[in-house]
Regions:
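Bacterial Sec-dependent N-terminal signal peptides
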Residues: 1-26
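Sequence signature of WD/YWTD-type beta-propeller architectures
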Residues: 19-170
């Protein structure tokens, strides 16, 4: 009986932890420069059905807080390395901002203090992108030419499938 109560409390605590809100940090200084991100997406024009534009921040920092704002609920993400945008909330935000723009604000924590970079924007088109992209997958050195494949990627998600491969076709 005590073991059951323990597990129930543990599950409840995990659920409460998952529902925590991202509190806005107290900013020590506005840096008045754009963050260095890879790939460099600042000022991009986005089709309304594109997959999330995940990126890495190349500036120094112990922790990052990214806020993507437009019409509707903003997306707030904390990260230590790569910034991965939740796909469901991303799609909602893009559809709510068709023909408008999104403002992306990046803050970094360095030695316990928070610094905010200048925000940048992404414009959201009312047009959609084609559903798939086909490409040839081959090692960069061309040493393994016998392990080539023709693949496709769904551009509104990260789903990749192999169309044909040297290994399967002989």
């Amino acid at each position: 009986m005590r073991l059951n109560i323990f597990y129930i409390l543990l599950i409840a605590l995990c659920g409460l932890y998952g529902c925590k809100n991202h509190q806005q940090p107290i900013i020590k200084e506005n840096l008045n420069i754009l963050p260095t991100i890879y790939p460099e997406y600042q000022g991009a024009l986005l089709p309304v059905n594109i997959a999330p534009l995940n990126f890495k921040i190349q500036d120094e920092g112990d922790e990052w807080m990214i806020q993507i704002q437009g019409k509707g609920n903003p997306i707030t993400i904390t990260a230590h390395d790569a910034v991965e945008i939740p796909i469901k909330r991303w799609r909602q935000l893009l559809h709510q901002n068709q023909g408008g723009s999104l403002s992306i604000t990046v803050s970094s924590r360095k030695k316990g203090e928070w610094y905010q970079y200048s925000p940048f924007t992404w414009d959201v088109s009312t047009d959609s992108i084609d559903s798939h992209l086909a490409y040839r997958l081959i090692e960069p050195t061309y040493a393994n030419w016998n392990s080539m494949a023709i693949c496709q990627r769904e551009l509104s998600s990260f789903k990749e499938t192999e169309i044909i491969s040297n290994k399967k076709s002989g």
